[in-house]
Regions:
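Conserved N-terminal phosphate-binding loop of PLP-dependent enzymes in the Aspartate aminotransferase
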Residues: 1-261
Length: 261
């Protein structure tokens, strides 16, 4: 799933990481290798105005959802039925379910994956039928004033690796722009598809992108990149610091060094 795109023990990564280990593996402060890698990633995709690092794809998706809520002041998200987005309560709703609880094809049920998932989480996730543009738009309209974001995987592997239809994607982009919601891409897997992620081939720019796996050179990593006005919500030196976020090993120099190779 793209976590070892270079293969096992790729010599340049082994050499660079070994050298970095001699300097230090975790400082809990910004490092030169973090800054260099952030600048590199932002140069690869037009939608990446700023980037922030964490430790996994699950964490990255969680951050995009929380940032979307902080930016819009809205509680709900929308996602595609059957799409996998990691283990965060809201992201995993209707990820994998028994066919007996799917509900109507035109109005899929919000089904928990983990037993004990709070009902509130299910109520705040709107499930969209994949590539059914008309019905998806109708469902979005029902919750237009409450939706913080629409979360999409451009090629969801849990629904058969079927690519997203251009009509569906364009409709989601246009709807979010019109209604003040954010369009979020989960490119934890698909970022390997193009130099700047699958979004480059699709020619649609999301507001936020979640990344993981392949940007770490085989080491634990996650990343969120996107619009500066949204990313600035996490900037403690900014004027609109409403989403405090940090982590002990986030942007650690080992993952940054390996990822930048």
């Amino acid at each position: 799933m793209a976590s070892l795109i270079h293969g096992h023990a790729y010599p340049p990564i082994v050499e660079a990481v070994t050298e970095q280990l001699r300097r230090g593996s975790g400082f809990m402060l910004a490092t030169e290798c973090e800054v260099a890698y952030a600048e590199h990633l932002c140069s690869r995709s037009p939608s990446f105005e700023k980037v922030r690092f964490m430790n996994s794809g699950t964490e990255a998706v969680m951050v995009t959802i929380k940032a979307s809520r902080a930016f819009t002041g809205r509680p709900k998200i929308a996602k595609v039925e059957g799409a996998y987005h990691g283990a965060y309560d809201y992201a995993e709703v209707s990820q994998i379910t028994n066919p007996t609880v799917w509900g109507d094809a035109d109005r899929p049920n919000g089904v928990p994956v983990a037993h004990g998932t709070p009902a509130a989480a299910l109520n705040d996730v709107i499930i969209l039928p994949f590539n059914n543009t008309q019905r998806a738009l109708e469902l979005l309209e029902e919750h237009a004033e409450e939706l913080a974001c629409v979360l999409l995987d451009p090629m969801p592997h849990r629904v058969g690796m079927n690519p997203i239809e251009p009509e569906f994607l364009t409709a989601m982009r246009n709807w979010t722009k019109t209604n003040g919601s954010l369009l979020v891409f989960d490119e934890v897997i698909t970022y390997r598809s193009d130099y700047g992620g699958l979004q480059m081939a699709l020619e649609v720019e999301p507001d936020l992108t979640a990344m993981g796996k392949m940007i770490g050179g085989g080491f634990p990593v996650g990343g969120v990149a996107g619009r500066a006005d949204v990313m600035d919500l996490m900037n403690p030196k900014g004027d609109n610091y409403v989403f405090p976020y940090s982590g002990t090993f986030s942007a650690n120099p080992i993952s940054m060094t390996a990822g930048h190779i």
